[in-house]
A protein has these predicted regions:
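Metal-cofactor-binding active-site regions of metalloenzymes
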Residues: 2-292, 344-346, 350-355, 362, ...
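Catalytic core of soluble alpha/beta enzymes
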Residues: 246-262, 280, 298, 302-346, ...
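Residue-level detector of anion-binding/catalytic polar loops
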Residues: 295
């Protein structure tokens, strides 16, 4: 492929297509701090705060977006997830970048080079070695805490298993970094009853709580123990991200005790029994979240680990997940209604991966809003494969049509990379351009200060108020 001849691609007005958009972005959105309420960053790396050292570590070690792009470009797996040298892996990524035009990877790559390293050149083979050296010189001295502060990241919420001892979150709290780092309670492993890994996981929880989980009542007691522990350490969010259709069925509490005991005896459970157990657990957890004042998140609509060959070679999160087409909105309705009926429905965010279900999810969340809690039920930001210009615009437009965009809690990275935070800038530029276009078309009043305040709320204030971050320990 020929060389791309464009040095100043990321300009001050990148993605801003009118004077109104420029004013909204530069005067209202640009300088706001970042609230990243869902990501997969390592609390250990932040606590230890050692320099990242190498751009390949930062960009390519766990980034399944880039892995998919490299595979699509014909790169051999050895240069993606294999044992090729860091430099060779970077060179293969540089070969791939020019071929990512119109994929969000192209925009993200150039934004990250610009914001963290002040590099204007398009990454490509002819300048790859120079950029590799320059980025590494910066990363040899930049620690995770410094990278976060550089981007004005005020709050991040990591994703953590209930058995985590949160030692690194405690260390971070004592270190008094610019960025506050809070855990998120993600109990996915509790839902795999009927599988061998469930029994192994129960033993792991027993080690945490120091008592036997020989019945369902003791499991709930153990869950209470871990939720209390997370709450004491600043947690106010949960997350649910199991592959497959969201399901919810009727159950009887006594029956769940019997199902748990049956599994403990090694007797194979029926599919109905598994769903009954999961439904009971969902209700119990959600009521506990409500009791604690937490926000619950549901990431729905993904089919994971489609490629057995790569899954066996690399493991989960190899870049072999995709959009699913599950029917699940009736089950979600029944679940939310069961909690709302007893006034035990916590603040809730749902993220759907299938864009054909955008209006379905947006309208479902609007069914359960409550007086006194603005935006209680959130249809979340464009997620994963939808986290790109078209997907973000569609999410903003559907939410505007079906709900209140003004109460939206804004963007998150859902990332494993400390260099991913320009995605907030990306979202903010798109948001400002969408609102400016409405002004130009006469669809909203030409009141820049009013709309600017709305943009500030979406990008920052709404999240602060929704999660009550100012009230954290």
């Amino acid at each position: 492929m020929s060389q791309i001849n464009s040095k100043n691609f990321i300009t001050d007005n990148f993605l801003l297509n009118s004077q109104e958009a420029e004013v909204l972005y530069h005067e209202y959105a640009k300088d706001l701090p970042i609230i990243d309420y869902h990501n997969h960053l390592s609390a250990q790396q932040i606590a230890e705060n050692k320099p990242v050292n190498n751009i390949t570590n930062a960009w390519l070690s766990e980034d399944h977006y880039k892995w998919r792009g490299m595979r699509a470009n014909g790169v051999e797996e050895n240069f993606i997830s294999g044992d090729a040298s860091k430099e060779k892996k970077f060179m293969k990524w540089a070969e791939t970048v020019p071929n990512t035009l119109r994929n969000p990877l192209f925009h993200w790559t150039q934004l990250e080079l610009k914001r963290y390293f002040n590099i204007d050149e398009i990454l490509q083979p002819n300048n790859a070695l120079e950029i590799y050296s320059k980025t590494n010189r910066v990363l040899e001295t930049k620690t995770p805490a410094q990278l976060l502060e550089q981007m004005k990241v005020e709050v991040i919420c990591t994703t953590d298993d209930p058995t985590d001892d949160l030692r690194y979150h405690k260390q971070i709290a004592k270190a008094r970094f610019f960025t506050k780092v809070y855990p998120t309670f993600r109990p996915d492993n509790l839902f795999f009853i009927g599988e061998q890994k469930f029994d192994t996981y129960i033993r792991k929880i027993e080690d945490c709580v120091n008592f036997s989980i020989s019945n369902y009542s003791n499991l709930l007691k153990a869950i209470d123990n871990r939720i209390d522990f997370f709450h004491e350490n600043g947690c106010k969010l949960s997350d649910y991200g199991i592959s497959g259709a969201f399901s919810f069925v009727d159950f009887d509490d006594d029956e769940i005790q019997w199902i748990y005991d049956k599994n403990l005896r090694g007797v194979k459970l029926t599919e109905l029994e598994i769903q009954q157990y999961r439904s009971s657990l969902l209700i119990y957890l959600s009521k506990k979240y409500h009791e604690k004042g937490w926000v619950q998140q549901f990431h729905l609509g993904v089919i994971r680990n489609n490629n057995d060959r790569l899954n066996e070679l690399i493991g989960a999160d190899a870049g072999c997940d995709s959009i699913a087409d599950y029917p699940m909105i009736e089950a979600l309705s029944t679940f939310l209604n069961a909690l709302d009926r007893t006034d035990q429905l916590a603040k809730t965010i749902t993220y759907n991966l299938n864009p054909s279900q955008n209006e379905v999810f947006a309208t479902m969340m609007g069914n359960f809003n409550t007086g006194g809690v603005p935006g209680k039920m959130q249809w979340g930001a464009a997620w994963w494969f939808l986290d790109q210009k078209d997907g973000i615009e569609r999410q903003l437009n559907v939410l505007s049509n079906m709900g209140l965009l003004s109460k939206f809690i804004g963007m998150l990275t859902d990332s494993r990379s400390f260099l991913s935070f320009p995605r907030h800038e990306y979202f903010r530029r798109i948001l400002c351009d969408v609102m400016a276009e409405d002004i130009r078309k006469g669809l909203v009043p030409n009141d820049i200060s009013f709309i600017g305040k709305m943009i500030e709320d979406i990008c920052y204030n709404n999240a602060i108020n929704y999660f009550q971050f100012n009230n954290y320990k």
